Curated annotation (Swiss-Prot):
Biased composition annotated in UniProt, kind: Basic and acidic residues: 60-71
Signal peptide per UniProt: none
Biased composition, class Basic residues, residue ranges: 48-59
Family under the similarity heading: Belongs to the bacterial ribosomal protein bS21 family.
Keyword Ribonucleoprotein: yes
Keywords, ordered alphabetically: Ribonucleoprotein, Ribosomal protein
Organism, scientific name: Teredinibacter turnerae (strain ATCC 39867 / T7901)
Pfam families to which the protein is assigned, alphabetical: Ribosomal_S21
UniProt name for this protein: Small ribosomal subunit protein bS21
GO CC annotation, single: ribonucleoprotein complex
Residue span of region Disordered: 48-71
Single GO MF descriptor: structural constituent of ribosome
InterPro entries for this protein: Ribosomal_bS21 (IPR001911), Ribosomal_bS21_CS (IPR018278), Ribosomal_bS21_sf (IPR038380)
């Protein structure tokens, strides 16, 4: 859990902004959204497999773009 200590003579808005930034970096909101509803283990596996396929297709497309002629 991210925590922020209020510095001396620091406005609350700045501390709040630092806290929000640290929460974003820690991935707190993404984790909350992911755990908002129960997801069956089969759905988790299916989603991860689909993401892997998408990543692979993106990688192949990026590699093919290197060899494409520009004339």
């Amino acid at each position: 859990m991210p925590s922020v200590k209020l510095k001396e003579n620091e406005p609350f808005d700045f501390a709040l902004r630092r806290f929000k930034r640290s929460c974003e970096k820690a991935g707190v909101l993404a984790e909350v959204r992911r755990r908002e509803f129960y997801e069956k283990p089969t759905s988790v596996r299916k989603r991860k497999a689909a993401a892997a396929v998408k990543r692979h297709a993106k990688k192949v497309q990026r590699e093919n773009r290197k060899f494409q002629r520009l004339y």
